[in-house]
Amino acid sequence: MAPLPAAATATASSAATPADDEAHSLLPSTPSNEEDDDDLEERAYEATEKVIVSISDFPDADDDEEESGLATSTAASGIPPFSWRKLWLFTGPGFLMSIAFLDPGNLEGDLQAGAVAGDTLLWLLLWATSMGLLVQLLAARVGVATGRHLAELCRDEYPSWARRALWLMAEVAMVGADIQEVIGSAIAIKILSRGFLPLWAGVVITALDCFIFLSLENYGVRKLEAVFAILIATMAVSFAWMFTDTKPNMKNLFIGILVPKLSSRTIRQAVGVVGCVIMPHNVFLHSALVQSRKIDPNKEHQVREALRYYSIESTIALAVSFMINLFVTTVFAKGFYGTKEAGNIGLENAGQYLQEKFGGGFFPILYIWGIGLLAAGQSSTITGTYAGQFIMGGFLNLKLKKWIRSLITRSFAIVPTIIVALFFDKSDSLDVLNEWLNVLQSIQIPFALIPLITLVSKEKVMGVFKIGRNTQAVTWTVATLLITINGYLLLDFFSSEIRGLLSGSILCVAVLAYASFVLYLILRGTELPNQIITTIRKSFS
């Protein structure tokens, strides 16, 4: 059931005034009766599951006249003062979101960029992370301002055929990401067991313990967030330890961050660095995670304060992720840049190469790498399953218990992942598989980015929280850049892989259908069609 605009609720009230109507019409579309709506519509979090953040309850413009003076004085004085306690209460969703910037696919992109390009692509890693932050802030804005997540909003925004296509694309992206994440964790288990546990056994262990970790949510969202904090800290300590042990050249590091440099030899690695940053499922995930705090989207001051703290938290989280990615890139740049091994390094054999290059030390670097990779694989697998719950529930409006949705989501990925583990148990095979999975992720990016920008730009959806024209221009520019970069990756990949007339013809048909759907999403989300129609009418009038 689509929610009624807040303006409609205000009009229905006999006590409402014209001023009240105007104030309500500027607020986002939210359910008029949350209890009734919860019976009909799937929700990211039930009211009893949400964390109380004690946002200052300043009256809004629609309160009675006696309190309106206080509202005016509060508005005049600005947002309530910053509170470290409130920031702590809001901390969690941003760090869960940042896991997608640290998954095994990103780590493989980091190590290959370091081995092939040295420190020269660190500036691109910084800017790619900044672009990723912009996209994730938009996702958080949608979730907080509307009280609904992106999959739910897409269900109401698009016709049935389009939303089914979007759901299918999101699920395909989810399965592809999940295979990478579970395989990464399984590789780590194989390393830490010294080869005793084969890849398929690591896959089964990862799939099972994912349910154990997710069950912690039954004891409160904060318990699950604490687990992720431990996993991120484990990654940070492991890769910082590697960074310290290998003693990279700090001058080259800072030059790499500050001085843009790109050669034809490193274009593929550059595209990989950018392509790993935007994970389609992560956009859906973040828009749902921010609803874990008790915020009334009908209260403008509560939304503004929540967005303030979420922005700070997300920035800190992605700054941490940038440092971890930097550690991995510089370690492999130090050890393998300019060597004959540079083109052969992948997740499966990276630990062995590190061991041969840097030796044992106090604690063998092979196991340090394995621990960091295990933390990355476990955390990203859990968030992937979490995202799958929201995607399926939002698009299909399934009122199922969370453990059932987790089981369904996990089932989509576990069978193909076990097959992959059985047939791709060698480094070369895993590298080929990873290339195909990266292509799969790249194909899906427009189907998360375009709906997000479309919805966050609509006053009917966002009310006063819709982004302005300048921000729209920036976001569409970033989206175009990301889609173009990933398009280059697709062109480069398919031009080397596709052979023969039949396969080429099939690819052309697929590209035409793909481009048509992307164009449909863009035109539906902009004013361009209306402008064209207006221009045509004027020319014939």
From Swiss-Prot:
Annotated compartments: Membrane
Main location: membrane
Ranges annotated as spanning the membrane: 87-107, 120-140, 172-192, 196-216, 224-244, 270-290, 316-336, 358-378, 404-424, 436-456, 474-494, 502-522
Record keyword tRNA-binding present: no
Sequence segments annotated as region (Disordered): 1-44
GO cellular component, one term: membrane
Domain of life (superkingdom): Eukaryota
Molecular-function GO term, any one: cadmium ion transmembrane transporter activity
Keyword Ribosomal protein: no
BP-aspect Gene Ontology terms: iron ion transmembrane transport; manganese ion transport
Cross-referenced HAMAP family: NRAMP
Entry-linked NCBIfam families: nramp, Nramp_1
Annotated function: Probable metal transporter.
Protein name: Metal transporter Nramp6
